[in-house]
Amino acid sequence: MRQDDLKLLGKIVTTHGIRGQLKVASFSGEFDTILSLETVVLKGKDGRMETFPVARATVHHDRVLLSLTPFTNINEVLHLISAVSYAHRDQFPPLEEGEYYWCDLIGLQVVTAAGTVIGRLDSILPTESHDVYVVRGADREYLIPAVEDVVVQVDLEAGTMTVSPPEGLLDL
């Protein structure tokens, strides 16, 4: 199994209860993708990757509780704490037009409508009103609001995001 065929989801932070449930912290802050999975791939501290069927997934506060087959008690899952979770992209639920998974946006080259390269989309900060794209340029970092007026086009095929930043935004 090639790791580049997988998309990063989150990390196992601890166990929950005595029946072998695992608490997953989602890196994107959204849960629907993890809740819809039939299988999950876990990469342990030793770098080894294993695929497990998902028996059950539920939201618990700000985490997802995963029950994986064949585990039924806490002692069987202790070695999975701190494992990083991945899933095959084809398991993700479909999105509406104009919606994107974070994992598809990270790494895009960000350019202005005039064609000036700003940098690469490095990470995404979730906020109450909208996400903020962290773009790493040659000599600095830019914070670009993920709003319709600023993000003009996303072209996943070309690997680009075109933005029309308000005057002064790139000077901050």
UniProtKB/Swiss-Prot annotation:
GO MF annotation: an example: ribosome binding
Primary role: An accessory protein needed during the final step in the assembly of 30S ribosomal subunit, possibly for assembly of the head region. Essential for efficient processing of 16S rRNA. May be needed both before and after RbfA during the maturation of 16S rRNA. It has affinity for free ribosomal 30S subunits but not for 70S ribosomes.
Annotated InterPro entries: PRC_barrel-like_sf, PRC_RimM, RimM, RimM_N, RimM_N_sf, Transl_B-barrel_sf
Gene name, Swiss-Prot/TrEMBL: rimM
Organism phylogeny: Bacteria, Pseudomonadati, Thermodesulfobacteriota, Desulfuromonadia, Geobacterales
GO terms under biological process: maturation of SSU-rRNA
Family as reported in the entry's similarity comment: Belongs to the RimM family.
Record's comment describing the protein's domains: The PRC barrel domain binds ribosomal protein uS19.
Name of the protein in its database record: Ribosome maturation factor RimM
Record SUPFAM superfamilies: PRC-barrel domain, Translation proteins
Annotated ranges, domain PRC barrel: 97-169
PANTHER family named in the record: RIBOSOME MATURATION FACTOR RIMM
Assembly description: Binds ribosomal protein uS19.
HAMAP family: Ribosome_mat_RimM
Cellular component, GO, one term: cytosol
Primary location group: cytoplasm
